[in-house]
Amino acid sequence: MKNILITGGAGFIGSHVVRLFVNRYPDYTIVNLDKLTYAGNLANLKDIEDAPNYRFERADICDYDKVLEIFERYDIDGVIHLAAESHVDRSIKDPFNFARTNVLGTLSLLQAAKEYWTRSGRMTGLADAEANAMLCRFYHISTDEVYGALELTRPEGWAASGQSESGGGPYGDDFFTEETKYQPHSPYSASKASSDHFVRAFHDTYGMPTIVTNCSNNYGPYQFPEKLIPLFINNICVGKPLPVYGRGENVRDWLYVEDHARAIDLIFHKGRVAETYNIGGFNEWKNIDLIKVLIKTVDRLLDRPEGFSLHLISFVTDRAGHDLRYAIDSSKLKRALGWEPSLQFEEGIEKTVRWYLEHRDWMENVTSGEYQKYYESMYSNR
């Protein structure tokens, strides 16, 4: 498989995957399909935009005819599907748009892949599913939020020496595994759960070689600042309030984006079709503790006194359906393919903060205009 369609490749995770594939596989043709909504930014790929093996197509994944035409023009034999609406707060305000993009858009891609791969002889039916995997592959990236929420069961101050297979993490005994049943609680996670089911259905019904992965929260360079880490780095820099839902007790597992891109590369090339793999960072943090780490790191790098920005923390009304804890078990991926995160969380945060401080122009460009209106509408009255 050498003609790879990467959807959402101008976004946060997608741009890291596109860059990795363009640089690592010069004999591949990498086609980046992106609608360029508010979170898509071609400046994320400025360093590889002139690479001879890179192509960009501005298109909506819901436009079936356009998607099929791209399959035909580039003879696409592999898909890495990252395009999605992904912000929970936005999904609560506009669930229809999330259903359209995440469910119908995924279905459009699946149908175009089935049509073209069947016509080109790469897919020959359910009975030949294993053989089909040698000729084409559809890799769908999903989220740990489809699993619902876990409980906080550790006493305050408890510290774990190991996680997952060793029997627990810092905030609870249990983890999401690939066998955890789906219990989505937000319009966003419900839309992703539905798209996951469609991907698996195309394998079970048509023999399409599919893989699904569910990842934890990503962080790193080029993340649009509606997400917690880049939003708060920017706010700390300029002295704006840091709106914290509830009391900041919610727990998330954090994964450095370049580690995620490495996992995607490995799974795309060596993962078993019809399998699901969890990709997590084994880095559980309460939101309030993470925010204090960000404050400490930004203030130190800006030569401010320790604790200088702590007063910016502002507790706001919690959002509806706010899951308490996510923790994902990546043991299967480590056993099967040898992947594990390369960075400790503190090292990843240091790299991330330094990147945003060194790229203030990028941040200023993406936080102007319509984003400012959205930010005010979300947090000004809480």
Regions found by a protein language model. Give the residues of each.
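C-terminal substrate-binding subdomain of Rossmann-fold SDR/epimerase-dehydratase oxidoreductases
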Residues: 4, 30, 59-62, 108, ...
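N-terminal Rossmann-like NAD(P)+-binding domain of SDR-like oxidoreductases, especially those catalyzing
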Residues: 1-218, 258, 268, 287, ...
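Residue-level detector of secondary-structure boundary/capping sites
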Residues: 189-190, 223, 285, 324
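Active-site helix-initiating loop/hinge in glycosyltransferases
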Residues: 220, 224, 253-256
